[in-house]
Amino acid sequence: MESTTRTIAARKHIALVAHDHCKQSLLDWVETNKAPLSEHVLYATGTTGNLMQLKTDLPVNSMLSGPMGGDQQVGTLISEGKIDMMIFFWDPLNAVPHDPDVKALLRLVTVWNILVATDRSTADFLISSPLFHQEVAIVIPDYQRYLAERLPS
């Protein structure tokens, strides 16, 4: 597939997602990084987003709960170019009923070349990068060209 570039603005749109056993860890990370996160637009799956707002007072665009379609809502935003980065603290040792949605979400961040951290160490590296507060160009699939090649003229 051909590729093109997309510019990620200095003010990032960040998805925050956590499995049940990882929610407290993500909430602790958000609290620690409240100041830099406050400069960006935050999205989260339902339970995580609501807890985040209660504990940090940060504005969060909350989707549905992950198992109720929230993971898919975040995936849609990624596909539409509306998410620039995802912090997803997932539990690799416990299966969840919506594992196919989780796998699809991780596939989409890879397809669309979205920055993703699945643990605190990686999230710390992302948020401490000088690029976190800068405009950045990323390479993404050229979906318009992809469609043009497959549709009759």
Curated annotation (Swiss-Prot):
Kindly report, in one word, the top-level EC class recorded for this enzyme: lyase
Q: Does the keyword Lyase apply?
A: yes
Residues engaged in binding substrate: H19, K23, T45, G46, T47, T48, S65, G66, H98
Query: What's one Pfam family the UniProt record gives for this protein?
Result: MGS
Q: What are the recorded GO MF terms, alphabetically? A: methylglyoxal synthase activity
Catalytic site positions: D71 (proton donor/acceptor)
Its Enzyme Commission number? 4.2.3.3
Record's CDD domains? MGS
Q: Which family does it belong to?
A: Belongs to the methylglyoxal synthase family.
| Protein's name in the database | Methylglyoxal synthase
Q: Which organism is it from?
A: Sodalis glossinidius (strain morsitans)
